[in-house]
Amino acid sequence: MTSVAKVYYSQTTQTESRPLMGPGIRRRRVLTKDGRSNVRMEHIADKRFLYLKDLWTTFIDMQWRYKLLLFSATFAGTWFLFGVVWYLVAVAHGDLLELDPPANHTPCVVQVHTLTGAFLFSLESQTTIGYGFRYISEECPLAIVLLIAQLVLTTILEIFITGTFLAKIARPKKRAETIRFSQHAVVASHNGKPCLMIRVANMRKSLLIGCQVTGKLLQTHQTKEGENIRLNQVNVTFQVDTASDSPFLILPLTFYHVVDETSPLKDLPLRSGEGDFELVLILSGTVESTSATCQVRTSYLPEEILWGYEFTPAISLSASGKYIADFSLFDQVVKVASPSGLRDSTVRYGDPEKLKLEESLREQAEKEGSALSVRISNV
């Protein structure tokens, strides 16, 4: 029995891809495979001011290490700040021992004679520890007002910080990491039509409600007036084998885009891996358990679109009759008959080694008369 041959490629984010505005330009993909933006923002006027105006979003987007550092520094800073204020109150009222108060003197805050004592009183008051060793007397109405102000301000601060922590934890970002796109898109015939296909799977048992997959074709475009648009965006529609607009994503599904005369992909040289474009895929849905909107993104470059392949079936039945989704087969593709009706352009920019190797594999498959599985992985 002939063994199945597999070929692995290493694909990094920094690639020698086709130029946007001319030959010889190195560029990175606009969107990484895991959905992160590769766009760098520069020369934004008053950027810091704009971020400070929207503190809520700024704190939520902040990385955890900076958030924890800011959280600790904020509490320690307020304890010390109000500790200094309590110390100044004690100085103004003559409560310090070095000021030699009279024997019948009643301090504003009992047992606060040093800056350290004032700091401890501030900490105990703000955290509502209340050891009882240091306490406010009725001698100073100003001290009572100061205590109320400290508790109100720090409570508001605690609510804000706690809210940003909870909002960051509750974001559906981690839920999006359990939605998986296939590493490659494939082009083959489906129901007698040439189709570009991608595979999507939900790796949790909880469902996504109202799933929709949309695509954006990013490429250089020249208008009739001669204007060059560096990243022109064109909608690419995807569908599944169902009449519903919201697929039931309980098992891995294959989404199809029919490459016909109305398709924005019809003039692209998909077979040769040639061209300067990027296909961005976006899956949107509602998380069943939290009702939060979740969005997952990925992108495909020309060399990540395989011509004349289809996905290996990844769903099977166990001996007990249960459905099994085998994710070891999720990214595997198998050679099939090439679809007809699509452009077959001469290779100009394709990776010569890759194309030569794939051609030799096709010839080997024809000689052996067996299906050839080619898997190209990103690392």
UniProtKB/Swiss-Prot annotation:
InterPro entries: Ig_E-set, IRK_C, K_chnl_inward-rec_Kir, K_chnl_inward-rec_Kir1.2, K_chnl_inward-rec_Kir_cyto, Kir_TM. ATP binds at residues 210-217. It catalyses: K(+)(in) = K(+)(out). Residues 89-114, 132-140 are extracellular. It is linked to Seizures, sensorineural deafness, ataxia, impaired intellectual development, and electrolyte imbalance: A complex disorder characterized by generalized seizures with onset in infancy, delayed psychomotor development, ataxia, sensorineural hearing loss, hypokalemia, metabolic alkalosis, and hypomagnesemia. It comes from Homo sapiens (Human). It is a multi-pass membrane protein. A motif (Selectivity filter) lies at residues 128-133. The keyword Transmembrane helix applies. Changing residue 167 to V: In SESAMES; loss of localization to the basolateral membrane in kidney cells; in non-tubular cells, forms functional channels; important loss of MAGI1-binding when transfected in tubular MDCKII cells, but not in non-tubular HEK293T cells; the orthologous rat mutation results in decreased potassium ion transport. Homotetramer. In kidney cells, it forms heteromeric channels with Kir5.1/KCNJ16; this interaction is required for KCNJ16 localization to the basolateral membrane. Interacts with MAGI1, alone and possibly as a heteromer with KCNJ16; this interaction may facilitate KCNJ10/KCNJ16 potassium channel expression at the basolateral membrane in kidney cells. Interacts with PATJ. The gene is KCNJ10. Changing residue 140 to R: In SESAMES; loss of localization to the basolateral membrane in kidney cells; in non-tubular cells, does not form functional channels; the orthologous rat mutation results in loss of potassium ion transport. Keywords: ATP-binding, Cell membrane, Deafness, Disease variant, Disulfide bond, Epilepsy, Intellectual disability, Ion channel, Ion transport, Membrane, Nucleotide-binding, Potassium, Potassium transport, Transmembrane, Transmembrane helix, Transport, Voltage-gated channel. This is ATP-sensitive inward rectifier potassium channel 10. It is found in: Membrane; Basolateral cell membrane.
